[in-house]
Amino acid sequence: MKKNLILLTGLVALFACGNDTSNNANADKAIQDSVQTFLSNYNTKYQEKNTIANEASWLTQTKIVEGDSSNAIANNKAQEDLAAFTGNSFNIDNATNYLKQQEKLTPLQVKQLKSVLYKAANNPGTLQDLVKARIKAETKQTEDLFGFEFKIDGKKVSANDIDEKLADEKNLEKRQKAWEASKEVGKGLKNGLMNLRDLRNKTVQGLGYNNYFEYQVSEYGMTTDEMVQMLQKFNKELYPLFRELHTYARYELAKKYKVKEVPELIPSHWLPNRWGQDWSSLVDVEGINLDSALKTKDAEWIVKQGERFYVSLGFPELPKTFWEKSDLYPLPKDAKYKKNNHASAWHMDYDKDVRSLMSVTPNSEWYETSHHELGHIYYYLCYSNPEVPALLREGANRAYHEALGSMMGMAAMQKPFMENLDLIPKNSKSDEMQTLLKEALNYVVFIPFSTGTMSMFEHDLYAKNLPADQLNKRWWELAAQYQGIAPPANRGEEYCDAATKTHINDDPAQYYDYALSFVLLFQVHDHIAKNILHQDPHNTNYYGNKEVGKFIADIMTPGASKDWREVLKEKTGSDLSAKAMLDYFSPLMDYLKKQNEGRKYTLSELK
């Protein structure tokens, strides 16, 4: 009898448990359905409003007419409308309440709801006047930056003209004039930057962030301290190599400019880049003079060749609208308006309307840049698919976009690739160590600029409320500490040299994306070279390899619908690490140490 009673009790319990399970499943489905309705409506409106805002923003970047504020006014209105939607209380309240039951939701729903709140934090509806003021200030700052008229000795010059002078000019006095001309724009941007700092900080504080830097870092699922520690870790790992490069560059540049006393810090106007972020043009590799080959091409060939590369990997041809709507080439000298000359890729409608803004001329820099920008374009096209909601049509994180674009630019510059295109003679002899040195002067030199000067300046600007009378002092302290460079003459606080870098104004508090992207690109490239192509990572040829194309497309296609760490581990088998980058440049250390024998090392030790 007792046995039967136990069995009966068990059956009752099982029946009750079954009912509970069924009820719970029904309840979970009901909440999931409710969330899905909310998200579907949100995604539709988000896509619509972003399309309008992107079109308005596009005009402010491609047609800057002095004295005509119509594009700016239209852009302000479109951005305010988008901000009012993403930051409205209905969306914030719903996303917040749904996330309280996130254990009942699908992972994709949870990701979207968190994205809703992240986007709301920059535009909270409770602070509408503040958001409108920020949008207006951002539009004006962009117009002031890109509408600026550069002059050398009173003569109008373009940003490209200045870059060419810094690349080719041998006379130090003329170089200094060009460098100083490039910094004049900062004077008029300083007050706007301080205003934007305050507006950006106050805006995100409305949803609980301490400052704008913390807000931007949070997209990685990290705290500010965690991000800073990771950046410093990468910087320290690459420090020994950069120290050798810095010493080598000081002595070689002093020799080039016939300066007897080698300075401890490299004068900025000695370098071929306005911010000292890329020194690669200091080295010419015999047998790989791409510029001379490209002189016979026109600007359109450069971009079309980039498309042919992606198509060879199995990607589709670019949409017809890309060619119709993009702004790819420099304006004629007699143009009645200006444009932003900084290369960028645009995802206009979060679907197939993709565009690029460039000023392509047939040289090696624009050749590499075009391959890079098309990397963004194909990333957009890959994740614009029914499996990825509009909210998550982004890179796995912001660094992924830059990593894949930069990787394709690097792949297009490798010797076997260029030989395949007859851009350099087949089986041409070149100095492999000089090639590696040239690459290091790009990729390695960039790390202290991005992780140090830029990221630490913006950290101090937003997280420490850097005072207006210390902006230039702090900028050059960081440039000395991390890059080992100095201005050609004293730069007082009437200047704002940081603001001459476009990202400080219009892509704020996220320049570390580029640093992380370089680490990531070498990790992914190393995997492709060794596991798919079975080639030396220094001498690869991606061209025409469909397996490489599929591997890259598989990373691109999920967009932000999968965790970035999961994507990396799944595709490469390891977590984010600078090891592949260190391995790639390891042959260079012995060479540089030999070159630097008897030379004085002056780069500051990193603490």
State where each predicted segment sits.
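C-terminal motif of bacterial Sec signal peptides marking the signal peptidase cleavage site
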Residues: L14-A16
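C-terminal, non-catalytic "cap/extension" segments appended to globular domains
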Residues: G18-V35, Q61, G67-S70, S115, ...
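N-terminal helix-rich structural modules
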Residues: N23-L193, T502, A509-Y512, R565-L568, ...
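Active-site-proximal, well-structured secondary-structure segments within enzyme catalytic domains
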Residues: K155-N160, N195-S356, K429-A440, F446, ...
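Active-site scaffold of zinc-dependent metalloenzymes
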Residues: E173-Q176, E180, A335-N363, L374, ...
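Post-HEXXH active-site segment of zinc metalloproteases
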Residues: F213-E214, S218, S359, Y380-M407
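Post-HExxH zinc-binding segment in Zn-dependent metallohydrolases
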Residues: L231-L241, E394-E432
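Active-site recognition of the HExxH zinc-binding catalytic motif
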Residues: T361-L381, E402-S406, F457
